[in-house]
Amino acid sequence: MIALGCDHGGYELKQEIKKYLDEKGIEYKDYGCDSLDSVDYPIYAKKVAHAILDGECEKGILICGTGIGISITANKFKGIRAAVCTDCFTAEATRLHNDANILSLIHISEPTRPY
């Protein structure tokens, strides 16, 4: 099972990923967030990291505006190896060579929005 988590910046992409996983018959558990309302990404990085470490899920996908903050937070947990990937090559390489267990994705719904 795949653990999914995001902040408000990643919510829309997470919804698309859920549709894709449903179509492919891949099981997942959504750990939030559940809307576009502003939230703090560390909450969801922690939930997904714990789901993997506790054995509820095998792998995870985390999404925030840059993918960086949420992956840094997840990597604070011993046994978690989160990697920001921007294409299929880096995703496959980090899985094969670094044994990454969380894929961290970028999603900026408003590219001109200041951080």
Where in the sequence are the language-model features?
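Short, acidic/small-residue loops that bind anionic groups at enzyme active sites
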Residues: 77-104
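Short beta-strand segments
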Residues: 5, 62-67, 85-86, 104-106
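Short, structured active-site "lid" loops
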Residues: 44-62, 66
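Compact, glycine-rich, soluble single-domain proteins
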Residues: 63-81
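Single conserved hydrophobic/aromatic residue that forms the stacking wall/gate
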Residues: 106-115
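A short beta-strand-loop structural module common to alpha/beta enzyme folds
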Residues: 27-38
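N-terminal beta1-alpha1 ligand-phosphate binding loop
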Residues: 1-17
